[in-house]
Amino acid sequence: MSSSSNTSSHRSYGLRRSQRSMNLNRATLLAPPTPSSLYDANNSTSSTSSQKPNTSFTSLFGPRKQTTSSPSFSHAAPLHPLSPPSFTHSQPQIQAQPVPRRPSLFDRPNLVSRSSSRLGDSPSLSPVAQVANPIHHTAPSPSDVRAFPIHKNASTGVKRSFFSSSMSNGAMSPPSHSPSPFLQSSQHIPPSTPAQKLRKKNNFDSFRISNSHISPFASGSFSPFATSSPNFLSTSTPAPPNSNNANPSTLFSSIPSSRHTTSNHFPSNSAQSSLFSPTARPLTARKLGFASSQTKSAVSNNHSRNSSKDASFMMKSFIPSNRSHPQTQQNESSLFSDNSMVNSSSNSFSLFPNATLPNPPSSELLTTPFQQIKPPSQVFMSTGLLSKQHRPRKNINFTPLPPSTPSKPSTFVRPHSSSTDSPPSPSTPSNTQTDSYFIQRENTPTNHNSIPTIQLEKSSMDFLRFDPPPSAVKTSHNYGLPFLSNQRCPATPTRNPFAFENTVSIHMDGRQPSPIKSRNNNQMSFAMEEEADVSQPSSSSFTLSFPSALTSSKVSSSTSHLLTRFRNVTLLGSGEFSEVFQVEDPVEKTLKYAVKKLKVKFSGPKERNRLLQEVSIQRALKGHDHIVELMDSWEHGGFLYMQVELCENGSLDRFLEEQGQLSRLDEFRVWKILVEVALGLQFIHHKNYVHLDLKPANVMITFEGTLKIGDFGMASVWPVPRGMEREGDCEYIAPEVLANHLYDKPADIFSLGITVFEAAANIVLPDNGQSWQKLRSGDLSDAPRLSSTDNGSSLTSSSRETPANSIIGQGGLDRVVEWMLSPEPRNRPTIDQILATDEVCWVEMRRKAGAIIYEGIHGSSSNPQGDQMMEDWQVNV
């Protein structure tokens, strides 16, 4: 082998394609090891070769130590004399047990490597297809590594036979596996850059997975230095793509001229690991998904055996070499344009477990864990405040809990439809025969056919499921709905859970019920001789129920006292501190009034002066259209009585509750509520008084729908005397009243603003909590938009034209309410400033009816005929 002496006379060049695909047939390898035969082998071409040389040289000749100055080769084939030899470095190859072998042609002790530059010049030691084959994942032990790698001469006959058979059957392949597709390739692509120097790697480098199909580096980002490019963890001769039937010239037709190599590391237990890992693969311009149909069964079997290792804690998986390569990014650049594996969950791989999962169909989007845990949107409201719409109505069969202020009445009146147990509905009685009222015992004969009566009787206890406390009062029958039939029985100052036997029901009827058999004389009947007025329409009977306090001797004396001054005394409601009766004037029968009676007597002169102050303030405010007028006041038996005008439509809070069940009020009616209440408050402030308890419960509604401010129990002169303390409703009270006891006119402005806010937003005001704090801080983000036109109208656009200067839906209501709810009292407007705004002036000019009367989205029509119709309606009503 004379060529071995000239190893240092040539420079290293890249291997030619023909040199790396030489036909190492049996005849050439079995030829005698003479210099002439070696020279003939050098002149052989690779055009007729269709198989790749065997790369498992390590498994045949045992392990050897790899250094930067002594490259190891899988096998050596003679080079053409005119072709410049080239070499590449490979990483250390380890094998636990060397394979016994006979001395071969390459076993020459004189061919000890001296330097990497000189070894590359040897024509007989040309690395044709260097492929490193890592057998183990651990570092080599000193006992398994030789001191110097010795390059052998040509192998013997036995060795050549095994070498050739391993090439034809596929090196290191199990018997059940098909031959490697790499052995069928006839062309190879040489690297366009010199091989990189091998750098030292740690024990965990075998866990790294370098993706050759998806690389974050473009073709222009190549660096020849191993430390500057992560694509070069190790180098070797490039391997063709994994395909059986694909033509290499076709597969790499789109590869750019500058082909950079990347390394792929796969586990040693792979079926084709001896041929494929680690290899230098050209970086293609597009992602290639090569799936071999012939090796699919081998891959699936090998992958199933290593399934436990695939799910490693490092979130990486060892993929067989003929499987689809990892796919970690999509649509990042032109390099990732192959969509062959985008929707494949079995052949795709990602460093993130859920990144390559297929998208579920649209029908299953609601069955994801997040969708199941997330509560439905109906659970929460969009505003954070409770709406009055579609809320269960309050049961009017029992008295609501006492209010936080003595001004809020409790209604006992409830409708009572006729039934078989009750008499027919009579005509409304009128007092024409006599003006005298008397208490009549049941044993007193009465002409029941001509005299309607008001029957007071003890309510029945038949509906109770528990035995009540013993009582001397017993009733045989009741002709009305029992009071508190579904009562929850809260313990309040005016009600006792065990005082049902003293509950009274007032039955107003057109005829006398059947005689009541009473066992004692404690049952009373208030009979009133009246003449039936046939001109009035008939009305259904109703029942008035109130607690036992009204049936005591005190209530009897107060009722008898009212009967001496008025006629048709009817209890309208009862609160914690007062009771309200509806009475008729004994002279003017058409005049009706409301009488307010305090439940407690004067506790002393100071208490008496405080109560009389309310009377004096209401007297001073007499004569305004939006102030409840005081008619008279007197004292009797230590109780204070006040006679005021009657507002037939009740209070504003009841109207808002009933209307809120259906929908929100239209904006024009909200503006009318603001205007009328502001007009009454302006009169109060101009008289140098402050109300300090302004709320919908204290705003009364007349028969015409006009609003009037009443209940001046918390009112005071302005400026407020020092040391005065008032407690109002926490839902409407101003923040400075609670914090600093500042009783001033801005406190009334805040109460007016929160009242308008409740009417416009149709929400239940919070009495505490975060929402309560946000309202006091001027934050209305939890509330819906107040200025809106989504309330709708039954009138068409042709009959109801929108005015050119309409303020409806322009956001004016939101601005005014937010202005009135300013946290700082000095930042709130005065009542005169509110009434001077353009919106209020526009509403005042267009409104024709009361505040609660619907006049359309934009108020009354500008058509004079429409105004005349409105006036005729008011007259007829």
From Swiss-Prot:
Residues binding Mg(2+), per UniProt: 698, 711
Region entry Disordered, spans: 1-128, 165-198, 230-278, 319-340, 387-435, 775-808
EC number: 2.7.10.2
Residue ranges constituting the Protein kinase domain according to the UniProt record: 566-843
Pfam family, one: Pkinase
Gene3D superfamilies: Phosphorylase Kinase, domain 1, Transferase(Phosphotransferase) domain 1
Catalysed reactions, as listed in the record: L-tyrosyl-[protein] + ATP = O-phospho-L-tyrosyl-[protein] + ADP + H(+)
PTM comment, free text: Phosphorylated in the C-terminal by NIM1/CDR1.
UniProt: ATP binding residues: 572-580, 596
Ranges of Polar residues composition bias in the record: 36-73, 85-96, 179-190, 251-277, 319-332
Family note: Belongs to the protein kinase superfamily. Ser/Thr protein kinase family. WEE1 subfamily.
Record-given protein name: Mitosis inhibitor protein kinase wee1
Organism: Schizosaccharomyces pombe (strain 972 / ATCC 24843) (Fission yeast)
Gene from which this protein is expressed: wee1
